[in-house]
Amino acid sequence: CAHVRGHMQPRADGRFAFIRDCGGFYIDDRPEHTAADGADKVVYLTFDAGYENGNVARVLDALAQADAAGAFFVLGNLARQNPDLIRRMAAEGHLVCNHSYAHRDMTSWSADEIAAELTRLEDACREAGVETAKFFRPPEGRFSESLLRAVMAQGYRTVFWSFGYADWDNDRQPSPAAAKAKILDNLHNGAVILLHPTS
């Protein structure tokens, strides 16, 4: 979604109206969350977590300190290599969601291939003792209508974002103050914020 001044909600390009038809969303657009001055102020913190480099636990610590919850879209690598973190996410009230097992472009896959990929991640989390929430985020944000329909057929809702902070490149990060200012400048009621616990 494009940045919208005045902290109003952005709107997706009309070509992507099928997102909603496929059970997907990128913003909380319920009436109480559509106005910048609405009574309810809400943002959703979502994290694409593929691997651990020492920051996932720090993010969990910060969320605990702030008494905040998030949704973690995890990959098979994190679930298999760090089952303790998957268990901690669930134990501390966060959603453990499906980001696929191997983080590959799924846009042209068959429905059976998609179902197998979702199940593979579910199984990895289940081995860690955690059931995944029925929310999916496509790897790299790449999607097609056929992918979203296949995901919906497996009982999932696809979660996109209304603001994605470019934090995946560890070598190109601004100062904490500049990062905070950028995020606050782009906040809007009902925002779904995409973050990565790698930087």
Regions found by a protein language model. Name each.
Residues 1-46, 51-61, 65, 178:
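N-terminal pre-catalytic segment of deacetylase/amide-hydrolase enzymes
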Residues 40-43, 53-55, 59-199:
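Metal-dependent polysaccharide deacetylase catalytic core of the NodB/CE4 family, i.e.
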